Amino acid sequence: MLLLTNDDVERVLTMADCVDVLRRFFEEEGKGQVLTRQRTESWLPHLTTDTFYQCKTMEGGVPYIGKYVIRIDSNVTRKRQQGQSSRVEHVPFGNGSWMGTLLVFSTETGELLGWMPDGYLQRTRVGALYALAADYLARPDAEEVGLLGSGWQAGGQILGLRCVRTIKKVRVFSSNTDRCSRFAEELQASLGIEVRPVATARDAVANADIVALATNANEKVMESSWVEPGQHLSSVRFLELDPRAYEDCDRVVVNRVEPWIQNHYLGELCPQDIKDAKLPPAPPGAIEAREFFRQRIKRTGAREKTLFPNEASNYQLGGQFAAVAGFVLDRAREKGLGRDLPVEWFAQTLLP
């Protein structure tokens, strides 16, 4: 059984590789070669006000590489105010750590093949998935990005977009101005492109070719009316998107053929915004994510406003993790990375 660290994962998983892995994944999914159990979240009360325990799981099988993967995240989450906005954050334990695990099983023998944390892989998978969507929906000449958010996932969005478009300029806004400035400076230094912090969300959106929302906000971070003809809009979190965008955009990808996130909570104890969250009605002509990825449906004109919301990213989510984690495990073995542990430590001689 191969034990990997985030550093190991980073050494074998490039953003470009991940885009290719997901592109093939959706090809195989279209042939019926993927099985997914959708994301499930369980919520329990916590002693601290506005704080909850959350266990998040999802899983999937990809027989074309002989892997079945289960993702388990165990978190304590809390809400906090940041200026006029409400934010959600995961509370670290011990020495500043979080618990997120991917278990990789063989579909040929049933044994546990590998264990790895999900941190670097998750950021890369999200960036690659949204890049794949942008490859189909953004204008071919798109080169300027308006980015809302300055955290871990926000950086992943730019790294992904650079795999499918020649990005030359990024305008970034965050309600945390100090972090936004540091983020812009670091991203510009690492990528060698112009990354400029701006004073308002509207300044970031105006005249951008691609508008990427990647915040930890519990409410909308921009107005749908700001979206301009020809722009491609995406959102990593459900609550950060103005629901009117579903009506205002010309081409919208949705995921209504699969159950949405399954939330389980003890009694009435659950974050209110989780309990109240409902998907907006699918607009006429909306494209199901299943058909979007299988057929690689693209924009129809230069002035078309396109939208790839969070719900679309959840299509075959467990299977996405299986494909990427399976690729990482195979590549790590090829390169001699990780620590081999006796499989007997994780097996038993009793049949339950």
Predicted regions and their residues:
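Short helix-loop-beta connector
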Residues: A138-E144, T166, E228-P229
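Adenosine-phosphate binding glycine-rich loop
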Residues: N6-E10, Y246-P352
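Rossmann-like adenosine-cofactor binding region
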Residues: G192-L279
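Glycine-rich phosphate/pyrophosphate-binding beta-alpha loops
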Residues: D118-Q122, S235-L241, A312-G318
